[in-house]
């Protein structure tokens, strides 16, 4: 809500001074403070965890220099911008849902650039892009008896039937995604618990519910940590 309120105030001020909005770009996000980063994702859950898991599921669109750009779900986290944020340094942003909707809501149809984006620390989008490629943020598939299955067994379900050229599950996931088995993306997936032999142990029905549980547990805001709004 902070981004909407500040945008509305700024736009009204421009209109009151007989100005015209020709370009509007807004980037925001809730993040852990830089001096309290405590996990490889450099992120903590400070709002609805389901919304974090399902971010980008409906794709995104925006307008840039008069051209409408449509980003399908599987490419949202691959379509990023680098931002130099004062006091934080280089951050990344990905497109946030339907920016064209806000062009109408804010009342500047004459603008030829309207972009709303979500800010994350560098590396988030690259990792989540591969989580999406695996298919784990899915709330349409109902899987029986998930409670008694392991996290590794759930991940295994999303691999091709041919086993992705053999090896253990980590190697097969890396082969399937065409990424390094020893790189940072795999390290983050491992840390999150996607290859764990531990039972899921909750009354989940969908992969998305399992992912929501995982990030709720692993990406908690510590008692001694601080979050911030950018």
Features from the language model and the residues they span:
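C-terminal catalytic/substrate-binding lobe primarily of soluble NAD(P)-dependent oxidoreductases
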Residues: 13-230
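Buried hydrophobic packing segments
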Residues: 7-11
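Short alpha-helices
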Residues: 1-6
